[in-house]
């Protein structure tokens, strides 16, 4: 991959694609800025590194080569002068780059600005009864530079409830509505409950949670922690604030709002699900997305789209939800990096929590900003999104997000009985069981264009499915199964008795078994029966 800048016939950077992301090759030899998530158990590769240019940038890949990629660039106002990137420029700024790298490596969770002149820290422990709040008022001009908190819990369920029942509200400069309204756990960047991780502006550690967003105000700030649950909560908190380094005029108020389905999917914009919609002048700084996906399978094929200042076509449009959050290939494994993390996982079945903070790549807007992400699966039967959006907004701007009732914040994620391919799944099988859309392998070849897909299991594992017989009688049994290059050898049984012999599902290509596989004749009584699938092994040719 070669990068050409400002019309030069010679590339400013000429490297193998993989070398951009290993943290070892100059000028990107900073492992906190150039990294492979494979090294921490996930998948995907990222490079956070400024490459300035004055006139033009052209990025060229080798002929007949391709991969998934995203490039983020920003255009400065006319008249702005920047140096053209080269290896020598990177050496000149090596001290600053090393400073950032070292901070990311060892000091996340501390203010990157260090101790600020004139800063003050308020520390307290509050007992907040149900329906009550703890309140703190500050006089400006100042900026809140850190909020930290810690609670004790009875168990995981209590933890999940408390972090959604407690709400942080912050009102700036006498405004009628709070600019910050967010369940406490989501404000600290993850959900549900407490999930330990560190990013640049937010994190949760053994010592408690932190948020390091810079939150300036001109005259006053009212900070409230409201208990909308049924249990008294004891909260230990710290709040650090400091004088402004410049007049408040020209700065923006920090906004942080939690929401679910505030803007329903519209027919003309389906499947765009709103992350943030706001009017005025400001900067978009990112989101945390809590996904509830009881159906299992991949939830996030949708692309992100950012419409700035009334654009009819988005200036940012992505390639998939996991790509936006900085990882790849639907990988559910945890990772934590300064600007993006996967902080909670249930293997893409159940809860997933991901975040992407736009700090170096924040998105400025003068009139309006709309950010959305495509959501292909409907709320019923069960894929639900909850979003925490963070942005700065000049006074007088429009923030359309109001408070969300407590019954819509906690307990809405109920696990339905597991079902896949039309079969109720009994018990908790090993691996992952889901319904897979088979349209891409041939329209009409499978009933309802889908099948039950069992992955992540090993020889000896069993999958039990419920079969309902409507009338007692003698039945000739058969099954249509799918064959593929990576499928195994299975044995089917009904109510503990084997049906025919082992079935080899290997084939170099994805096909249904036609004609259906004969399974013999059985006398079956009316009611429920159990069909068992056992993995025996695999064909030597299978991959």
Locate predicted features.
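Beta-strand-centric surfaces of beta-sandwich/beta-rich domains
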Residues: 1-419
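Extracytoplasmic
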Residues: 304, 408-543
